[in-house]
Structure formats: C-alpha cells, structure tokens
From Swiss-Prot:
Belongs to the class-II aminoacyl-tRNA synthetase family. Type-1 seryl-tRNA synthetase subfamily. It comes from Leptospira borgpetersenii serovar Hardjo-bovis (strain JB197). This is Serine--tRNA ligase. The gene is serS. ATP binds at R263, R264, E265, V279, E350, I351, S352, S353. Its main location: cytoplasm.
Length: 417
C-alpha cells in the first residue's frame, strides 16, 4: 500500500517501478490518480456544504429566538443535509475503490535493487565458507535421512498426502535441537525477544503484511471460522503492533518466534518433489524488527548478519544474493537471500530471505510511533528467516555425511541432544 501523495507526485516514476517488477496493469496508476482527484473535489464540495449548513443552522436559531417563521429555512437545511449524505456516499464508494486498487500495488524498489526479469538475474554479493569435497558421490538429504531411519516420507504421505514427512528418533531430536539453538542465539546474542504466537490469524492480519488480497489462493484458509493458517511467523509477529502507536523510546523492537508454517505450494508443481525443500508444513524461526525510518537500512544489515551467524556457527557454506526487480516479492523494497550449499543436490538453495519493507506494511496495518515532537509517524518493518529449520536440517545431512552413511552433528548442536 503506497502513500497517496507519492502516487500523485511521482506517477511516471511509479509506472517505471511497476514495469521493472513485471506488473502488467501499469495503466491502473492513471485510474488511481483520477480517483484521488475526484475524492479531493468531492471532499471540497462536502466541506463547503457543511460550512453552509452550519451558517444556516445558526440563522435558524436566531430566527427561532426572535419568534420568526423557520419553515422555509428549515427546508433549506434539510436539502443541504440530503446533498451532504449523497456526496458522502460517493466519497465512500471512491474510497473503497481506491483502497482495493492500492492494496494490489507492489512496494517501491530500493535504488540498490538490480534490474532483472527472474531469479537468473539475481546478483551474488559474496560467499562464505569452503564448499566441501567428497571422495564419494554425495547423496541427497532424503536418501540419507531414510537410510538412517531419521525421516519417513511414506508415513507422512499416508497421514497428509504429497509433500509430507515424519521425523524419528535422532532425526526428531535434530529438528528440536535446531529450533532451540536458533532461538537461543537470537535471544541471548542478538537481543531479540521471544514470542509465542498463534498458528491461525484473521484476514486483517494477512492483509496488513501483504499476503491478502492479492495472494489469497496461495495459503490455507479455514472458511467456517474465517481464519488462516500462517505461511510464516512474519504475519502474527508484525501484527502484534497493528493499529497501535509505539513510543519512540521503545524502538527498535526486535522479536522472534518459532512456528509451523503452512503453504499450498500451488505454483511449484514438479519442483523439488522429494525431500524437505518444498513441503506444505515446515518449521521456521522468524525475525521481525520495527524501527524508525532513518534506522531501517542499518537494522536490515544487522538482521542479515544475525541470520548469517546461524550458518557460520553450524559451519555451513553459503552465499548472499540480492534479488532483482523481477524476482523480489511484491511487498519488499529490498531483499537479500541467503543460499546454503547442498552437495547432494549440487546447487545452492535458499535458506533465508531478509527483507526491508520500509513503511509498506506499516501503512496497511497502521503501525505508527509517536516521535518526541508528538507527531505520529509510520514505522519501518523488517523481517527474515532465522532460519528455515527443515532446509537447515537438509543442509546438515548433505554437508556432514561420510562414505558409510553417518552424519556428523555440528559441534554447537551436541549439547541439545
């Protein structure tokens, strides 16, 4: 959701941004600008009528006080009132159309975002860690997990259908160890406050963070109760402060949560059909920050380093890329992806996205802070995975396997077993 003043004053620049993002309905900006202008004209008209009604109402009072006949002037007041209601109805209709269009617009891109059409145009920023070499052909994580009896995909499919799995024995312990390890690092070393949040949220929450209305078909919804299974803890964590005004001295606020995440993966038919990479339910530790606009770039960098620190402690090789204009999410202004090396799959795989939304989500969710001069301003929101646990699990199996099928648990996790 964009600032209306920005839309009217930067129409051509906004169209260019939409084109870079691959947004096809660029002409909608001209329509939006026309609606904004009509709203302003209607508002001026209704303000003048209210002013007229106030003057006439005072005159009615004066005539009544002097004992005069108010029949004619009262009829005039009634007509003005009816005209005001008529224009207010038009105003409401225009406002609803404006909001619906604005909710479908993507965020403004940061100048640092490279131009591009797809994931192939993303730009590598740097690589960390040495890619391991093996004296044998490394196996993919799903083969390793099944051989160790740590992962049972067959029973997952039996329970829930495709893209499901179950963990067993030390395999289940590894999942729990990763969750506790990540939360401990983020709370004890990085200064985040741990929060437990629901796995079901209302439509207002999904709208504030940008999942609704545009991407409604991508998520699981419980129609009877008008609730939605969360695709990420970003949704409940960000909405903790929806419709609230935060005192300036409380910023920045940094929160983290471990949750299950649920995604339909409707557009991924045929992609990563085996293993833990693309499933309908997975575990993730999420990071969310609320900060002042002038601090958001620095806080974004900090969050990226926090997500990277988990991989450094686990000694997993990875790289950081910046997403191009055609691959970045509609809600984000700038996003860095962290991709971990997967020897068994012989490729890098996304394990975290760290995004700065600027005031995009805050405007949708009315998340503000009161500055020292008493003014209410929109915060900036930042979020990232810290990390996706299933993919981290898969990376450990592939990077720390040996020739006889054993997996060596990273040193930092051993105390959690």
């Amino acid at each position: 959701m964009l600032d209306l003043h920005y839309i009217t004053e930067n129409t051509e620049d906004l169209k260019k941004v939409l084109e870079l993002r691959g947004f096809k309905e660029v002409g909608i900006i001209d329509e939006l600008k026309s609606i904004i202008q009509r709203k302003r004209e209607l508002q001026r008209e209704v303000d003048l009528l209210r002013e007229e009604r106030n003057k006439v109402s005072k005159e009615v009072g004066r005539i009544k006080q002097s004992g005069g006949d108010i029949t004619e002037i009262s009829a005039s007041v009634k007509l003005v009132g009816e005209k005001i209601k008529e224009i207010e109805t038009k105003l409401e209709q225009e406002e609803n159309v404006l909001i619906n269009i604005n909710l479908g617009l993507p965020n403004i891109l940061d100048p640092k975002v490279p131009n591009g059409k797809s994931e192939y145009d993303n730009v590598v920023q740097y690589e960390v860690g040495k890619i391991p070499s093996f004296s044998f052909p490394p196996k993919p994580h799903f083969e390793i997990g099944e051989a160790l009896n740590w992962i049972n995909f067959e029973k997952g499919v039996k329970l829930s259908g495709a893209r499901a799995y179950t963990y067993w024995k030390d395999g289940a312990k590894l999942e729990r160890a990763l969750m506790n390890f990540m939360l401990d690092v983020h709370t004890k070393e990085h200064g985040y406050t741990e929060v437990w949040v629901p796995s079901m949220v209302n439509d207002e929450s999904m709208t504030a963070t940008g999942q609704y209305p545009k991407f409604k078909d991508e998520f699981y919804r419980i129609e009877k109760d008008e609730l939605n299974l969360i695709p990420t803890a970003e949704v409940p964590l960000t909405n903790l402060y929806r419709d609230e005004i935060i005192p300036e001295d409380q910023l920045p606020i940094s929160v983290t949560a471990h949750t299950s995440c649920f995604r339909r993966e409707a557009g991924s038919y045929g992609k990563d059909t085996r293993g833990l990479v693309r499933v309908h339910q997975f575990q993730k530790v999420e990071l969310v920050k609320f900060c002042k606009p002038e601090d958001s770039e620095e806080e974004h960098k900090k969050m990226l380093s926090h997500a990277e620190n988990i991989l450094k402690k686990l000694k997993l090789p990875y790289r950081v890329i910046i997403l191009c204009s055609g691959d970045i999410s509609a809600n984000s202004s700038i996003t860095y992806d962290i991709e971990v090396w997967m020897p068994g799959l012989n490729r890098f795989m996304e394990i975290s996205s760290v995004s700065n939304f600027r005031d995009f989500q805050a405007r949708r969710g009315k998340i503000r802070y009161k500055s020292k001069d008493g003014k209410n301003q929109l915060v900036h929101t930042i979020n990232g995975s810290g990390l996706a646990i299933g993919r981290t699990y898969a990376a450990i199996l592939e990077n720390f396997q040996d020739a006889n099928g054993t997996v060596h648990i990273p040193e930092v996790l051993k105390s959690y077993f």
